[in-house]
A protein has these predicted regions:
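Solvent-exposed loop/turn segments at secondary-structure junctions
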Residues: 11-13, 49-51, 94-98, 124-127, ...
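Short, conserved loop/helix-junction motifs that constitute active-site signature segments
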Residues: 82-83, 108-114, 137-139
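Charged helix-capping and loop-helix junction motifs
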Residues: 102-108
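Short, glycine-/small-residue-rich phosphate/pyrophosphate-handling segment
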Residues: 118-157
Length: 172
């Protein structure tokens, strides 16, 4: 099965394990790279043209403003032709109970009709939020599988859960 792992991740000050920590590599990026290694296929970083604030609280405010206004931030790089892709492992952090707005831009900009979308959401306790419902609404012609919630501060030990989830969905 030809698979694409697409992810949005943020470096900088993040809330993890009950405190603010400085992440040189975002939790979602680490989880996405593990999923991509297990599933094979291409790895694509969903990156906004603009950088999000390094400071956690400032980033939260920007993300709230984007969600409230329905912003669709421009992507720094477009994903290209996905016609040969059968499954998209979509990895993102939970922001404001859903996906960061660049992920919305990605989903709306790709033809995902008939493709399987496997959502994986990093968070510190909020789970998937309403992201799975949002993905179904944005991609009504795709098959959105049951997602996997990964605690960001425990991503280093999430390998077995990620592998089991990918096996359950027949990706590996």
């Amino acid at each position: 099965m030809k698979t694409l792992t697409a992810y949005f991740s943020r470096r900088g000050m993040n809330y993890a394990g009950g405190k603010l920590v400085d992440l040189k590599v975002g939790n979602t990026e680490r989880a996405a790279k593990l999923a991509s290694e297990l599933a094979g296929g291409a790895l694509f970083e969903i990156r906004a043209e603009h950088e999000y604030p390094y400071d956690y609280r400032e980033c939260v405010e920007v993300s709230k403003e984007e969600l409230t206004s329905g912003a669709r931030p421009e992507l720094a790089v477009e994903p290209g032709d996905l016609s040969g892709v059968e499954a998209v492992i979509l990895c993102y952090p939970c922001w404001c109970d859903t996906m960061p707005m660049p992920v919305w831009t990605f989903l709306e900009g790709c033809d995902l009709a008939g493709k399987r979308i496997l959502p994986m959401c990093t968070n510190e306790g909020s789970g998937m939020g309403r992201s799975e419902a949002d993905i179904r609404r944005l991609c009504p012609e795709a098959v959105v599988e049951k997602g996997l919630s990964v605690k960001g501060s425990a991503v280093e030990s999430a390998g077995p859960a990620i592998e089991a989830w990918l096996r359950e969905h027949g990706v590996i």
